Amino acid sequence: GRGAEEARAAIAEGFTSVMFDGSDLPLADNIRLTRDIARIAHDNGVTCEGEIGCVGYAGGTASARTNPADAAEFALETGVDAMAVSVGNLHLQQGQSGDIDERALAAIAIATRGRVPLVIHGGSGVPSVQRRLLARTTPVCKFNIGTELRQCFGTALRQSLADQPTEFDRIKLLSPTEAPLVEAARKVLREMKGIGS
């Protein structure tokens, strides 16, 4: 979310985790706002993720890499439970052609001294082999793979519409998307464990 009110609303609705993205703000403002939201979350038994360094978009907004010293200050001052970083990852990347800068990630891990688990937004673009390596050997605890799953959903929905051109019942149209999405998520988890596809 983009502010304390969104975080409060999510907490009031029963969410168990909130994410605040102040990465486009000056460092001091990002720290202050993220710290405030983390306090609200923690006071309600909810975890909070923050972001430092701006993760750009494939074919769009450019990224701003996470500075290790800033990451250390952010982790220490905000009290977040997880911290999203920008190390070559991009949102909306189709296909696994991306490449995480492992040296930059290692520098952040050293600077933060293991104070906070790290998160990779734009994880759909990270090759499976690299995701597995990072999950096993770095403080990365979460990869966001929304693009990967949305592509699967889109393919399944288009097939459902083609198979049922006169159907109008949304449940009948959307039901065939569930199994492919579940299998896509399971495939990612199997690959993380090194079980194969």
Segments (PLM) and residue ranges:
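Short beta->alpha connector loops
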Residues: G1-R2, S124-V126
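Alpha/beta enzyme core
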Residues: R2-L118, R131-P139, L157-R158, G194-S197
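Glycine-rich beta-strand-to-loop/alpha-helix junction loops that act as flexible
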Residues: E51, G88, I120-G125, I145-T147
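C-terminal alpha-helical cap/extension of soluble enzyme domains
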Residues: S128-S197
